[in-house]
Amino acid sequence: MASMQKRLQKELLALQNDPPPGMTLNEKSVQNSITQWIVDMEGAPGTLYEGEKFQLLFKFSSRYPFDSPQVMFTGENIPVHPHVYSNGHICLSILTEDWSPALSVQSVCLSIISMLSSCKEKRRPPDNSFYVRTCNKNPKKTKWWYHDDTC
């Protein structure tokens, strides 16, 4: 078994056995391929997203964990957030330039939970319309400009 597959198996078990708060692996999503997962997410209590349900799509290349996973919101409900575009793309540095092989699916999930939980106002990024019209389907091919750490 390739090192990528071993690593994904290990992370899959960790996510099944000890998921971050409000996160659940969609078991059906991994039945056909270990390289594409859907994680169901519920907004944390006491936040602007409390009780809302979202889905995250994780896609892993053959270079994982040296290459970050492609992660985006998918489905009917995309959170309205200053770092989440209406097409589901997430502007989060650990998904691109700050990625490290020491990070994991769980650490990505925790970062997304933290990002949503710290939000003070539901709004889209200022360039949402332009970005959604002109972006690549793969958010990893975007050259992100990280202009703040808050929302």
UniProtKB/Swiss-Prot annotation:
It catalyses: S-ubiquitinyl-[E1 ubiquitin-activating enzyme]-L-cysteine + [E2 ubiquitin-conjugating enzyme]-L-cysteine = [E1 ubiquitin-activating enzyme]-L-cysteine + S-ubiquitinyl-[E2 ubiquitin-conjugating enzyme]-L-cysteine; S-ubiquitinyl-[E1 ubiquitin-activating enzyme]-L-cysteine + [acceptor protein]-N-terminal-amino acid = [E1 ubiquitin-activating enzyme]-L-cysteine + N-terminal-ubiquitinyl-[acceptor protein]. Pfam families: UQ_con. The keyword Cytoplasm does not apply. Keywords: ATP-binding, DNA damage, DNA repair, Nucleotide-binding, Nucleus, Transferase, Ubl conjugation, Ubl conjugation pathway. Autoubiquitinated at Met-1. Widely expressed, with highest expression in brain, liver, pancreas and heart. GO terms for biological process: antiviral innate immune response; cellular response to misfolded protein; DNA repair; negative regulation of TORC1 signaling; proteasome-mediated ubiquitin-dependent protein catabolic process; protein K11-linked ubiquitination; protein monoubiquitination; protein polyubiquitination. It is found in: Nucleus. Its EC number is 2.3.2.23, 2.3.2.25. Transmembrane segments: none annotated. One of its GO terms (molecular function) is ubiquitin-protein transferase activity. InterPro entries: Ub_conjugating_enzyme (IPR050113), UBQ-conjugat_E2_core (IPR000608), UBQ-conjugating_enzyme/RWD (IPR016135). Residues 3-151 form the UBC core domain. SMART domains: UBCc. It is an enzyme of class 2 (transferase). Coiled coil: none annotated. It comes from the Eukaryota. There is a cross-link at residue 1 (Peptide (Met-Gly) (interchain with G-Cter in ubiquitin)). Changing residue 83 to N: Impaired substrate ubiquitination of both Tau and ATXN3. Signal peptide: none annotated. Homodimer. Interacts with FANCL. Interacts with STUB1/CHIP. Belongs to the ubiquitin-conjugating enzyme family. Accepts ubiquitin from the E1 complex and catalyzes its covalent attachment to other proteins. Specifically monoubiquitinates the N-terminus of various substrates, including ATXN3, MAPT/TAU, POLR2H/RPB8 and STUB1/CHIP, by recognizing backbone atoms of disordered N-termini. Involved in degradation of misfolded chaperone substrates by mediating monoubiquitination of STUB1/CHIP, leading to recruitment of ATXN3 to monoubiquitinated STUB1/CHIP, and restriction of the length of ubiquitin chain attached to STUB1/CHIP substrates by ATXN3. This is Ubiquitin-conjugating enzyme E2 W. It comes from Homo sapiens. The lineage of its organism: Eukaryota, Metazoa, Chordata, Craniata, Vertebrata. The gene is UBE2W.
